[in-house]
Every structure is written in C-alpha cells, then in structure tokens.
C-alpha cells in the first residue's frame, strides 16, 4: 500500500471527538489546578517584566542601596556610576569584547 493510499483512506475524527472531555467540569481538582496554572502564568509574566526591580529589592531590602553614611560625596558618586554601568551592561544580556 502506498503512502498516498494511506492518506486517502485515513478518516478524520469528528468534531465531537476533538473536544476536551473536562471542559465545564466542576471537579474541585480541575478547578484548583486551573487557578494555580493561571496564577503561575501571571506571576511568571510579572517576574519577567519587573525582574530587575524585584531582585534589587530582595538584595537591598527596602533601602535604595547600601548605606553611604560617612562616605565622602566623591566616593558616593563613583559608586553610583559603577552601579549604573553594571545595570546598563545587564540590559543587553550581551557584552561586546574587543580584542586588541
């Protein structure tokens, strides 16, 4: 039997056979798993959108960064520039390295 014959004789399932058998189910396990799945998806999307803010908050707590009390202003500015450059590098996920 050739491949063409097999394709021609294959019978597609009717629409009723394709439908999900658990749609409209009031089974508590199905409802709970659906809610957990939706919450997981929402949290994952929020994590991807705001991961820098979230993890920076976890790292430094509610403060904006490490304490600069008693540190001269010039050193504070240098530290801010270092932190900003580290964040800027993270934006692209790639770092260009030039070999001389």
From Swiss-Prot:
The record marks 40 as: Essential for channel activity, possibly by being protonated during channel activation, and by forming the channel gate and the selective filter. Keywords: Disulfide bond, Host cell membrane, Host membrane, Host-virus interaction, Hydrogen ion transport, Inhibition of host autophagy by virus, Ion channel, Ion transport, Lipoprotein, Membrane, Palmitate, Phosphoprotein, Signal-anchor, Transmembrane, Transmembrane helix, Transport, Viral ion channel, Virion. GO terms for molecular function: monoatomic ion channel activity; proton transmembrane transporter activity. The record marks 44 as: Seems to be involved in pH gating. Its main location: virion. Gene3D superfamilies: 6.10.250.1640. This is Matrix protein 2. It comes from Influenza A virus (strain A/Chicken/Hong Kong/FY150/2001 H5N1 genotype D). The gene is M.
């Amino acid at each position: 039997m050739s491949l063409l014959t097999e394709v021609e004789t294959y019978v597609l399932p009717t629409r009723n056979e394709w439908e999900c058998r658990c749609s409209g189910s009031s089974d508590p396990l199905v409802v709970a798993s659906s809610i957990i799945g939706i919450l997981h998806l929402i949290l994952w999307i929020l994590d991807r959108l705001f991961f820098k803010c979230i993890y920076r908050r976890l790292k430094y707590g509610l403060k904006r960064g490490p304490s600069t009390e008693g540190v001269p202003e010039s050193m504070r500015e240098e530290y801010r520039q270092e932190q900003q450059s580290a964040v800027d590098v993270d934006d692209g996920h790639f770092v260009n390295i030039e070999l001389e």
